[in-house]
């Protein structure tokens, strides 16, 4: 089934919201997500709350921001493109000459048509982001600058969804909701995860429980960990950071710090069979919330599956990261299925033990074909090869690797053999 168009339409719906690490844009985004997953809980943590080595920052609100040129033209209008205003800009109103103004203008020199994405969360300043082409056309004279913003003691918001399975042990899925109008680096993660959550809520026989969060990057994951660490360390057995999953350029894998968790094994297996040319990165290439989840002392078994990795593609952190050119419906569908395949693999990754000594007699159970066809040999060989490694020690993922076959091509076979009591599940 292709979910790409539905995910793309949802991304289009929330693209223009001004998201940051705090503020109304985060709440608007979470509210939009909750329309798809009504059980999502929107939570808040007060500014100035100590979270490990950090402090929850003040909340940021933008009313308007723009520049009036000497000729009276309005440029860098926040209402036209929210990337024009540097994130967390402090208030400013005044008139500046061109040289003074340039101290507060930011461009992307190598991409003259792009508006760069710039933030200053932890040092108070104001600024505007402008394309190099527009910057080069600025004329001498006096410019009127309006930055109508407010920093105040408020809250940091995040969304949390818990889905109960047969076991208390959890699979953890995390994405961020703190960037303004950018498609792959921002919206691909939360929109894909929204639809994965919708699917999981409809599953009636989940083996594991699920902890799914939508957070501001870095400060959000630090805050969430500070509030939930003991429970997370006790229960989480696998998980994925969901980021940059909307383009068609590549598939990518970023390992956990140790690189040997079930999340790593599953990610490598799934990507091998989806795209054998996938890009494999090292822990040293980390850059998103896996930095916190896999930090020493936290040590959660979290890896990352991307399409093209954040920081790698040229449109990253600019206005060129858009819906249509970078993020497509087909790209989002590919990202969705890569992570869904990984989740399903963890759910199905049981150990099986054959229940008879020597090879079982398949014909008396009606499992051996009586008519020889072109593909008969391959089907029988796969079945017998599968049984031959069901020793109670090999997991289904191990078996798939031994047989050099995608794990999802073994689900039906395992169920059938178990239903005939030829194999049984081992914990």
Map each language-model feature to its residues:
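N-terminal hydrophobic/helix-forming segments and targeting peptides
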Residues: 1-427
